[in-house]
Amino acid sequence: MRIFEKAPAKLNLGLDIKGRCDDGYHELAMIMVSIDLNDYVTISELKEDCIVIDSDSSKMPLNNDNDVFKAADIIKNQYGINKGVHIRLEKSIPVCAGLGGGSTDAAATIRALNRLWNLQMDYDEMVAIGFKIGSDVPYCLGGGCSLVLGKGEIVKPLPTLRPCWIVLVKPDFGISTKSIFRDIDCKSISRVDIDLLKSAILSSDYQLMVKSMGNSLEDITITKNPVISTIKERMLNSGADVALMTGSGPTVFSMCSTEKKADRVFNSMKGFCKEVYKVRLLR
């Protein structure tokens, strides 16, 4: 029996660092959306008690450092599963890009194993497992437009956004999320008004939404990688309604109210970076 799951990428329309918790992690407030740039996870059972991962990508580890392996290992141990599993990852989401590729693959693995082994986990049980792996995994279990709070474990669905076009630009380097979070100074970091952004979404006010979007991590990443600022400027000069880094970077995305605008931004960036994508929001 094979189980097939689609694993969509995510974007941060808003990412605010509210402070540092006593355990060293940060309290977050984020608004996230899913886009139609997808990885695909195919899972089948093995007789041997092991976890085997293979992929069409050579840009990530296929051992216990992979979030997919961690998801399978936690579930096997938690539910006393003595069977093995083969996990095939077909990658389209760039690695170490701020698009949640590892997190969405882990979430897809949790959903798939729940079906394969008939574990009958409810959403909260899957979230608890996902949160052990990473702060974006709980969101990726359900996706869509959502408010994400705490350390990532609190996910509250929001209304679907109006249709629009997204252009993604991924520079030719990756970013370590841990290294960016290590450099956060909660006293001086730029803040994002997530409540205002949420209000704009609830009232379907597109203009207010794009004005309210922001990312507290952007300045830190730009200090290390100034090309991100150049990408934003080029996108805005090409007619993007907004240009913003997602996650800890380095991917920059623009939102465009029409496909014509998106095509103009896309064409302006193709000669500047190798990895440029035109996608839609998932509804």
Curated annotation (Swiss-Prot):
Task: Enumerate the catalysed reactions.
Answer: 4-CDP-2-C-methyl-D-erythritol + ATP = 4-CDP-2-C-methyl-D-erythritol 2-phosphate + ADP + H(+)
Alphabetical keyword list: ATP-binding, Kinase, Nucleotide-binding, Transferase
List GO BP terms, alphabetically.
terpenoid biosynthetic process
Question: Which residues are involved in binding ATP?
Answer: P94, V95, C96, A97, G98, L99, G100, G101, G102, S103, T104
> Which GO molecular-function terms appear in the entry?
4-(cytidine 5'-diphospho)-2-C-methyl-D-erythritol kinase activity; ATP binding
So which residues are the signal peptide here? none
EC number of the protein: 2.7.1.148
Top enzyme category: transferase
Q: Which residues form the active site?
A: K10, D136
Pfam families, alphabetically? GHMP_kinases_C, GHMP_kinases_N
- Give the matching InterPro entries: GHMP_kinase_C_dom (IPR013750), GHMP_kinase_C_sf (IPR036554), GHMP_kinase_N_dom (IPR006204), IspE (IPR004424), Ribosomal_Su5_D2-typ_SF (IPR020568), Ribsml_uS5_D2-typ_fold_subgr (IPR014721)
Q: What does this protein do?
A: Catalyzes the phosphorylation of the position 2 hydroxy group of 4-diphosphocytidyl-2C-methyl-D-erythritol.
- What is the similarity comment for this entry? Belongs to the GHMP kinase family. IspE subfamily.
Cite the PANTHER family for this sequence: 4-DIPHOSPHOCYTIDYL-2-C-METHYL-D-ERYTHRITOL KINASE, CHLOROPLASTIC
What is the protein name for this chain?
Answer: Putative 4-diphosphocytidyl-2-C-methyl-D-erythritol kinase
Q: Which organism is it from?
A: Streptococcus agalactiae serotype III (strain NEM316)
Q: Lineage in the entry?
A: Bacteria, Bacillati, Bacillota, Bacilli, Lactobacillales
